[in-house]
Design a protein with these regions (language model features):
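Secreted, luminal/periplasmic, and some membrane-associated catalytic domains
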Residues: 1, 17, 45-76, 91-96, ...
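A structural signal for well-ordered alpha-helical segments within the folded catalytic domains
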Residues: 2, 26, 64-71, 151, ...
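Low-complexity, glycine/alanine/valine/leucine- and proline-rich hydrophobic stretches
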Residues: 355-413
Length: 437
């Protein structure tokens, strides 16, 4: 990546610590609001509706009730252009342009504000793509489609950049995340399922070569006095495997099924759960969302509300003792939302469990006769997230290039507001980083 290497040589750069949980939703919303996930009321891609066991919803732009940087800039009369920042559907009304994100429903046409811009955007990109089906065995197709998607995104970015002299321009590109999920085991010899496949390794390398080229083409349009910053909301690492949270809860007597064990890969919602004998159940993903079956809250609750804290502590102790197939401790770390966040709004899980510093995914499906899986239970996946993302500030004002101090993702929003001379709302929890830009 020669262009990025050249930029790095005149940048301040370092690690950007993500949030709990280190997931795209809520991390980008935290970054640009300066407010933690609990206060925002967003804890991941899926949230359980109150009063149900399995009814779920995906957060949208309207879920975020706190203003983000572009909202405050818009109120101040600044012109903004935002591309793909999640959650971004439906596109919020801003003083400028907002193009929706990868969570946009298939077939949606209302993905850009103002709507009058859509025909031009479609023409420039030959159809604006939002994401690629990346958890699939056909890696060659995945690689080709990711390269094409990212090229179209950058074509849109060049088109939008050239429309007017924006005060603030932000572009989110989901492609690198997808490349990691689909191809990590082909370029990392330390991956537990490493495959020496030159063609697939080459696809990953081709993606990054293309990305470097596209970054260069976009920045060639940017005047030298414009501040350029690269940010990521989380890092990536090899996926070690999956821990079957519901299989474990069954083994401990906290979750009870009726009848014989279900076939492998059975979702919990399709299993015969005996809720009258169940104290807790879990959901899969980058971390385990654990819910308690509480009387008066769940339809068939078994735990008294006064028992919840003690039961959570018991589960935490039991999870801490879990060992991997190699005999080593799994490294389960349990977080209770009310102890982690300033506030707990929205529909939070009762417990959040990370496994092996999030190197192990949580599998919510059943029927394996084992607590561990080598592969993801919802489709092929080579990588998971990590807490350390990156920042890179090109040509920092103070001239201090090279490695910089570790920073916190939640501090980016107030730092940008300070840079623009805007007051920082009193409920913002992050702090401006000085110097940074």
């Amino acid at each position: 990546m020669p262009k990025v290497r050249e930029l790095l040589g005149r940048s301040s750069f370092g690690t950007l610590r993500s949030v709990d949980p280190p997931i795209t939703v809520p991390a980008w919303a935290v970054m640009f609001s300066g407010i933690d996930p609990g206060t925002l009321g967003v804890y991941g891609f899926r949230h359980r509706r109150p009063g149900s066991y399995f009814d779920q919803y995906v957060p949208s732009s309207s879920t975020i009730l706190q203003p983000r940087v572009w909202d405050l800039l818009s109120r101040d009369g600044r012109r903004v252009c935002v591309m793909g920042m999640p959650p971004g559907y439906p596109p919020p009304r801003v003083n400028g342009v907002y193009v929706s994100d990868f969570l946009t429903p298939d077939g949606a046409t209302d993905y850009v504000f103002p709507a009058s811009l859509r025909p031009e955007l479609e023409k420039v990109t030959n159809g604006y793509p939002f994401d690629v089906l990346f958890r699939a065995e056909d890696r060659e197709r995945v690689g080709r489609e990711l390269i094409e998607m990212t090229r179209r995104h950058f074509a849109a970015a060049r088109f939008l950049w050239s429309k007017e002299p924006w005060d603030f321009f932000a572009m989110h590109e989901i492609g690198p995340d997808r490349i990691h999920h689909a191809f990590w085991k082909f370029f990392d010899p330390s991956h537990p399922r490493y495959e020496a496949n030159a063609a697939f390794r080459g696809l990953a390398e081709a993606y990054y070569a293309m990305l470097d080229e596209e970054i260069g083409r976009l920045l060639d349009l940017v005047p030298k006095d414009v501040k350029v910053v690269f940010l990521s909301d989380h890092g990536s690492q090899a996926m070690q495997g999956c821990f079957c949270i519901n299989e474990w809860l069954i083994s401990r007597g906290h979750l009870t099924l009726r009848g014989p064990p279900p076939p492998p890969g059975t979702p919990l919602e399709k299993a015969a759960v005996d809720w009258t004998k169940t104290q807790a159940w879990g959901a899969g993903g980058y971390y385990a969302r654990i819910f308690l079956n509480i009387k008066g809250r769940e339809p068939q609750g078994t735990l008294e509300p006064s028992q919840a804290a003690a039961f959570s502590e018991r589960l935490s102790r039991e999870l801490a003792e879990v060992r991997r197939p190699d005999g080593k401790l799994l490294g389960a770390e349990v977080k209770i939302p009310r102890a982690v966040y300033h506030q707990v709004n929205g529909d939070a899980p009762d417990m959040m469990a990370y496994f092996g510093d999030v190197a192990w995914r949580s599998a919510g499906t059943l029927g394996y006769g084992s607590l561990f899986l080598e592969e993801n239970d919802t489709g092929p996946d080579d990588a998971v997230h990590s807490f350390d993302g990156i920042y890179m500030v090109v040509n920092p004002t103070d001239g201090a290039t090279g490695p910089g101090a570790p920073r916190e993702l939640i501090d980016i929003g107030p730092t940008l507001l300070s840079y623009f001379g805007l007051p920082i709302p009193s409920n913002v929890q992050g702090k401006p980083i000085v110097p940074f830009l």
